[in-house]
Amino acid sequence: MSPFGSKKNRSLSVRVSTFDSELEFKLEPRASGQDLFDLVCRTIGLRESWYFGLQYVDTRSNVSWLKMEKRVRDQRVELHASNNVYVFSFYAKFFPENVSEELIQEITQHLFFLQVKQSILSMDIYCRPEASVLLASYAVHVQYGPYDYETYKDGMLAGGELLPKGVTDQYQMTPEMWEERIKTWYMDHEPMTRDEVEMEYLKIAQDLDMYGVNYFPITNKNKTKLWLGVTSVGLNIYDERDKLTPKTTFQWNEIRHVSFDDKKFTIRLVDAKVSNFIFYSQDLHINKMILDLCKGNHDLYMRRRKPDTMEIQQMKAQAKEEKQRRQIERKKFIREKKLREKAEHERYELEKSMEHLQNEMRMANDALRRSEETKELYFEKSRVNEEQMQLTECKANHFKTEMDRLRERQMKIEREKHDLEKKIRDADFYVHQLTVENDKREAETEKLRKELICAKMAEREATARLLEFLNSGRKSSTDSLLTASSVSHAANTASSMAAISTPSLITSSSTNDLETAGGAELTTHSSHYLVQGDNSSGISDDFEPKEFILTDNEMEQITNEMERNHLDYLRNSKQVQSQLQTLRSEIAPHKIEENQSNLDILSEAQIKAGENKYSTLKKLKSGSTKARVAFFEEL
């Protein structure tokens, strides 16, 4: 009876999420995990189903893998109360040892690409900054196709999540700076199909230390906290603080049996002389997951070392035919693209040549137009210059006439000045004579004054004597005589003083008149020079003109090319490593040391020591199984 019932009231609602789609199914209540898994694989067209599984969160909030042999409803799958739907995630449960040799279908590669990319971006898988940029360029190639300078726009990559947050946080770089470095790698990629680009992405990602490793916390007999890493080639033991470099490893061909009892996990090795490898987990649920992953990885490990089954051979043949067909189509596409690019280049050159000729013609027309404008400008300037010359000549004649007039006036002023100077000299001489005469008269006046004083004194004496004489009896006649003599002497003295004062007044008046006349003449003279200064400006003209100016052999070639792919990859890997080293050096100055995580520090130590994932595993496998078990127990 089919597991997919038709009764809606009894069916189970299931939603399965992949990285690029969501699927919804109705299952019969008795449907097993295998029924649901097969339905999902058929829906998405997946045949390499052994790598994948259905993951869910159980009723205890633990992440678990759906068991294929048990019914879905019996596996403690949490039922969403809002819509009664069982929710699962379709993830890769096991990883191949070599993606380029083992992954056959394009859909398988695509699912691995999406999951690994998401694990790197979410930092579940540690990736160095320079490798993150390279992987981001491949992710851009998958999303947008080969680089096309015509369609690419600056800022086109800013919207998507391309780099892990841990990478962007530890460097002081803007999104534009990161985009420029991703774009540089993107431009260097050869034109490839989407599946080829995804394969290149996975080839680089599988070299990362944490790729394909499922980590579980464990302890040894000394109760030392460690990490158990379940991988496609065996079991790795890691230090609690270092998930990158394993302390020791055991390959699946060295392990005979795996079992657990409660929290104790026992691994029996192929070498009977070596004691069992024992560790302890935190709870029973982790032990069940470890056992499930160990069984699945061990089966795939042994399967890879056996001849391919008919189904796988058929799948590989179909994939090879499909790849050859795509190679033929790609060759044809590349040839057509080159022809189209050549035609476009020729058309571009013709358009460029035509545009160049048009520019030259436009420039010639512009030059001709400017020449005509210049010619007109020169004519106009010539006319203006002639007018200015005429105006200048008129002004020169006017200035000449004015200068003659001023020269005559200057001569007249000189004559007046000469006459005035003569008058001033005469006046000075006259004043000098008057001064001398005045001094003489002042001396005479002083002399007369003294004589007057002496006369007054003599008069007093005479009066005294007269009074004495009058006492003798001739009083009346003597008084008359004395009075007449005094009046006559006073009149003579007043007349002499008036004669002396008059010349002094005349001299003062004459001097004032001369000074007034001289001042008027000097003022006129000064005004004359001011006028002459105001009208002595000239006219200059410094204006200057400015200048303006697939056949039968294709299948064989494709087959040989496919055989050389691996060798080409090894050759290209050296070039990629060199480019990664260059990028690491470029971004090193922008590093913020305090933002580095523990994994960043451990990775830097790996680089300095010259170690990588494969060299470390090779060293660990060089020791004997017994020595590795003893080393684990002593940790």
Swiss-Prot record:
GO biological process: axis specification; cell-cell signaling; compound eye morphogenesis; compound eye photoreceptor cell differentiation; endocytic recycling; endocytosis; epithelial structure maintenance; hippo signaling
Keyword terms: Cell junction, Cell membrane, Cell projection, Cytoplasm, Cytoskeleton, Endocytosis, Membrane, Transcription, Transcription regulation
GO CC term (a single one): membrane
SUPFAM superfamilies: Moesin tail domain (SSF48678), PH domain-like (SSF50729), Second domain of FERM (SSF47031), Ubiquitin-like (SSF54236)
CDD domains, per database record: FERM_B-lobe, FERM_C_ERM, FERM_F1_ERM_like
Record localization: Cell junction, Adherens junction; Cell membrane; Cytoplasm, Cytoskeleton; Apical cell membrane
A Pfam family it matches: FERM_C
Membrane topology term: Peripheral membrane protein
Cystines in this chain: none
Main location: other
Gene Ontology MF annotations: actin binding; identical protein binding; integrin binding; protein-membrane adaptor activity
Superkingdom of origin: Eukaryota
Functional summary from the UniProt entry: Regulator of the Hippo/SWH (Sav/Wts/Hpo) signaling pathway, a signaling pathway that plays a pivotal role in organ size control and tumor suppression by restricting proliferation and promoting apoptosis. The core of this pathway is composed of a kinase cascade wherein Hippo (Hpo), in complex with its regulatory protein Salvador (Sav), phosphorylates and activates Warts (Wts) in complex with its regulatory protein Mats, which in turn phosphorylates and inactivates the Yorkie (Yki) oncoprotein. Mer acts synergistically along with Ex and Kibra to regulate the Hippo signaling pathway.
The protein's name: Moesin/ezrin/radixin homolog 2
Record lineage: Eukaryota, Metazoa, Ecdysozoa, Arthropoda, Hexapoda
